[in-house]
């Protein structure tokens, strides 16, 4: 059997007749939360039976989740072959003014998805990298993470969703399937998540950044930089030996970006390693001529890590220097500090009960095993 979520609507149209049935199937799956073909009552019975014999709609199963006191939820999913991946739901808030200028608050969500089982980039600060790469996810397995999280949390179809490819794996090391997932998510017949609300994060595969740009998908780009010298970056991120900082910056300068948007540079701040004002000065020079936004990220400690979480004062000084020199800079609001927030932590805890994430305030967090026979709500829309 094949995963129907792997199919674009054009591919599905080639498999069903008449072709308008493909649109109906897409609407059931992406807009009405159907998880079984038997729920698609406007399809002929024989077609439903035929589809059920050839395809499945549930590429993953949630085996555990942890909910933080800040509302973020980390999920551990099991794939059909028994391998496990992680995804995260980050509830946000945005302010919207009505016609009278009165501000009302509306929830919005960011979903962080994995693109691979494991990762071969070998970043020193990343728990996922310690296990190496097992395999790429298919487009349907990537899309399935978003579908499951939206369905489980009863997020309305119309509600704004941002997708970030920042979970387990290097997205550009699985560019074929990631680019297909981007296109499937953007289809109006499906979830209609615009590419401009999808961000691909990379450790800096220069040649793949170029390929992604040539695809002209309209997605946003985020670069995991984390250091301002090649010596330190090579220590933290072995990929720097193949694509050094200069090569990454050259690739970024050639990447097509919406004039209203900026390239995001993610900078993981590690105590006494890359958190000085001197580092900030070097970063300003590196970003010269690039329409950039820097996102400072607190290092999330985990058991066995040699690195420490930076002080708030260091973060603020770093941010202040960048802003004073014309670089847009934010400090990422730390979410999930009371759960296994760092990439790979929940998977590691599930597989190794002796492992403990170095987190605080665990009494506020909620951890649950998910039953395997969850009933899924199907929208009546």
Curated annotation (Swiss-Prot):
* Chief place where the protein resides: cytoplasm
UniProt keyword Metal-binding present:
yes
* Keywords associated with the record: 4Fe-4S, Cytoplasm, Disulfide bond, Iron, Iron-sulfur, Metal-binding, Methyltransferase, rRNA processing, S-adenosyl-L-methionine, Transferase, tRNA processing
Q: Name one GO molecular function term.
A: rRNA (adenine(2503)-C2-)-methyltransferase activity
Tell me which Gene Ontology terms the entry assigns under biological process: rRNA base methylation; tRNA methylation
Record's subcellular location = Cytoplasm
Enzyme Commission code: 2.1.1.192
Cellular compartments per GO CC? cytoplasm
In terms of PROSITE patterns, this protein maps to: RADICAL_SAM (PS51918)
The further comment given in this record reads:
Reaction proceeds by a ping-pong mechanism involving intermediate methylation of a conserved cysteine residue.
Q: What does this protein do?
A: Specifically methylates position 2 of adenine 2503 in 23S rRNA and position 2 of adenine 37 in tRNAs. m2A2503 modification seems to play a crucial role in the proofreading step occurring at the peptidyl transferase center and thus would serve to optimize ribosomal fidelity.
User: What is the designated name of this protein?
Assistant: Dual-specificity RNA methyltransferase RlmN
